[in-house]
């Protein structure tokens, strides 16, 4: 009986992964307005009933898609935190590489996350996910730039640079983004040429780096 139950759970998880991959692709390629149960069913090549079973309402589907995109961006963030812990003095270049990856390898996920940021303005339930996005990056930057206020300023500027780089006319210019981000963070360094304090350690094993229910 346990094996049967485990098998069903695994199939259910695989199906949700399939549906959310399709949902994120729709949002990233066509915009939030294109995200419907029927569109996900068609993109995932499953029945409409399968989508509504896992995500009964449009809000359920939208929030799950945003969290899924955020979790995949979170894997990139975990890479960033790990590298920063190993090479704290190289943080500007590491962040430059991170943002370049967001607009290339993780372009669709990143667009979906920005759709979430905009949607959070009128959907309070998305607020915690948005705030976690900003808080985790700011915590990483604080030791380098010297204060929480400066870290949140840099975080907001990074979001603006990434958003600009996502525009179609900038899609083939990740190198310019990398340089701009590295330069921005160097300009905000608390003590130019001085030592860099210890950075935020990687999240504990088992903690999802972008899970809105996990502590900041």
PLM-predicted stretches and their roles:
Residues 1-5, 213-216:
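Short, intrinsically disordered or compositionally biased N-terminal tails of bacterial proteins
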Residues 18, 22-60, 64:
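Helix-turn-helix
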Residues 18, 22-30, 76-83, 112, ...:
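Solvent-exposed, amphipathic alpha-helical segments
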Residues 67-73:
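Short, basic, alpha-helical segments at the C-terminal edge of helix-turn-helix-like DNA-binding modules
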Residues 74, 103-114, 119-153, 179-183:
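Amphipathic alpha-helical packing segments from all-alpha helical-bundle domains
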Residues 77-110, 154, 178:
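Hydrophobic alpha-helical connector segments
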Residues 126-127, 131, 144-210, 216:
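Hydrophobic/aromatic-rich alpha-helical bundle segments in the mid-to-C-terminal region
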């Amino acid at each position: 009986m346990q094996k049967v139950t485990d098998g069903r759970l695994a199939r259910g998880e695989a199906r949700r992964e399939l549906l959310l991959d399709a949902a994120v692709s729709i949002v990233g390629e066509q915009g939030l307005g294109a995200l419907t149960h029927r569109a996900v069913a068609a993109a995932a090549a499953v029945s409409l009933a399968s989508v509504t079973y896992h995500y009964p309402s449009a809000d359920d589907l939208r929030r799950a898609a945003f969290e899924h995109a955020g979790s995949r961006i979170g894997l990139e963030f975990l890479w960033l935190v790990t590298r920063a812990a190993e090479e704290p003095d190289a943080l500007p270049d590491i962040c430059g590489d991170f943002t370049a990856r967001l607009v290339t390898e993780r372009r669709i996920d990143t667009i979906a996350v920005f759709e979430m940021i905009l949607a959070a303005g009128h959907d309070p339930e998305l607020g915690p996910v948005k705030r976690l996005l900003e808080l985790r990056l700011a915590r990483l930057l604080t030791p380098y730039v010297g204060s929480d206020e400066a870290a949140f300023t840099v975080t907001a500027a990074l979001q603006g640079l990434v958003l600009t780089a996502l525009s179609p006319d900038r899609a083939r210019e990740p190198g310019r983004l990398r340089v701009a981000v590295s330069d921005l963070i160097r300009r905000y360094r608390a003590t130019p040429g001085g030592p860099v304090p210890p950075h935020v350690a990687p999240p504990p094993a088992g903690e999802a780096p972008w899970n809105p229910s996990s502590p900041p």
